[in-house]
Amino acid sequence: MPKPINVRVTTMDAELEFAIQPNTTGKQLFDQVVKTIGLREVWYFGLQYVDNKGFPTWLKLDKKVSAQEVRKENPVQFKFRAKFYPEDVADELIQDITQKLFFLQVKEGILSDEIYCPPETAVLLGSYAVQAKFGDYNKEMHKSGYLSSERLIPQRVMDQHKLSRDQWEDRIQVWHAEHRGMLKDSAMLEYLKIAQDLEMYGINYFEIKNKKGTDLWLGVDALGLNIYEKDDKLTPKIGFPWSEIRNISFNDKKFVIKPIDKKAPDFVFYAPRLRINKRILQLCMGNHELYMRRRKPDTIEVQQMKAQAREEKHQKQLERQQLETEKKRRETVEREKEQMLREKEELMLRLQDFEQKTKRAEKELSEQIEKALQLEEERRRAQEEAERLEADRMAALRAKEELERQAQDQIKSQEQLAAELAEYTAKIALLEEARRRKEDEVEEWQHRAKEAQDDLVKTKEELHLVMTAPPPPPPPVYEPVNYHVQEGLQDEGAEPMGYSAELSSEGILDDRNEEKRITEAEKNERVQRQLLTLSNELSQARDENKRTHNDIIHNENMRQGRDKYKTLRQIRQGNTKQRIDEFEAM
């Protein structure tokens, strides 16, 4: 019994381990991987490994795994990666798993600076990545520092701006909050729609030379072949769509591309190693096949997948609507509960206020009753004193009258009578004065007693109002709510030194529709506005001395009004012969 081979396959978000037989082919292993992760759009992907010479290589599907140049390690390591890219992610990617794998791979490419991304776009993409991971921003859940462990922006961008890590996170948090209501899957798609407009997105670069020996870059992507100058990977100078190519072949380091235009010469370049020509051929064949397939009616399988994806998307929307309805209902009940508690607290406060007012009124009433009794007692004493003084005065008058009679009846000494008379007269005057004062006091006490009586009557009326006021209404009673949320290409098959492949262009519907495209920022005003705002914000913190060569090229392209698709239209102008001649002259 042959000993099994342990294999570890690393996808963008998981590690899978298998035990395969020595005679297992690359396709059998590939099929096992895609079945495990539930992927049906298999044509974009491949298994990559590092060969015995340290070069990254795609596993050949038609050969045994053990017969290829894989390293003898346990387990044998493979990466499951996108080998080919769609032209337009929004139109072509069908399954959520496909979309997620592309999102993670493109994000990694941007963060590692494999794909150049300008600062304002990097921040906006970072906010979509946060939405894709965390969902809607929630102030209660997403406290300060919730992004501290996330890789969000290329290190190059952070180094170029005088902003702390916290300030970067604050900016991304603000834009994260802007995406409220967006599904995680939708956030991934928005990320890819913006990322696919980056100049280096989806391109495989190879070092080549033309017949003159000029060092150049060959870019192979979903739309065709592009030629770049050695110091500029952002701006292609010449382009050839796949629909213009009928045959590709190589012999050793020489690569020959035959155009459909019979009058045009062959497009010839040289690669430094035979291995590179094999990879170029493999990518050309696969990209050409997908380019042509996209321009033909969908196969039955793709139609079924799209129908299923639409149904799943519709189901997700229904589930989301149900969740939103439940969430709104829950929020309404929570608000009602909070309102009830507030009203209850207000009623309790009002009740306490009533009780305090009642106690104060009772206390004031008691004090006023006591004061009124004191005033009444003082008035009574003053009245008695006044009556006593009046009695004394009357007695003095009687005595005076008696003395006068005695003076008339008796003859006394004039001096004695005069003295007695003067004495009683003075006493009478004093008593008269005292009587007047007492009368004034009595009048004043009577006035104060009347005021006290009026206050007493008023206080009794207030107390009567408080005591007879209706009690506060009881707090409303809410029934508890029961929540129920439903969960619910070909591969390398090259000969040792050479290979040739015919590329058919028959039956396609529109071979150059990619030249009509515009960027996401150009067709989406919201994205355009967000990028402009971010650019203005970041310009104030930018350190111009730390700009890279790619930054300078990108800014110059922006200044001249160029973008990926305008450049594409420009580099395909003229016939095939003119462009090949231009390539030879570089």
Curated annotation (Swiss-Prot):
Residue ranges of domain FERM in the record: 2-295
GO MF assignments: actin binding; actin filament binding; ATPase binding; cell adhesion molecule binding; disordered domain specific binding; identical protein binding; microtubule binding; protein domain specific binding
Known tissue expression: Glomerular epithelium cell (podocyte). Expressed in cerebrum, cerebellum and hippocampus (at protein level). Expressed in the small intestine, lung, kidney and ovaries.
PTMs per UniProt: Phosphorylated by tyrosine-protein kinases. Phosphorylation by ROCK2 suppresses the head-to-tail association of the N-terminal and C-terminal halves resulting in an opened conformation which is capable of actin and membrane-binding.
Keyword Cytoplasm assigned: yes
Residue positions, PTM Phosphotyrosine: Y146, Y478
SMART domains per record: B41, FERM_C
Regulation: A head-to-tail association, of the N-terminal and C-terminal halves results in a closed conformation (inactive form) which is incapable of actin or membrane-binding.
Entry's free-text remark on domains: Has three main structural domains: an N-terminal FERM domain, a central alpha-helical domain and a C-terminal actin-binding domain.
Protein name listed in UniProt: Ezrin
Gene this protein is translated from: Ezr
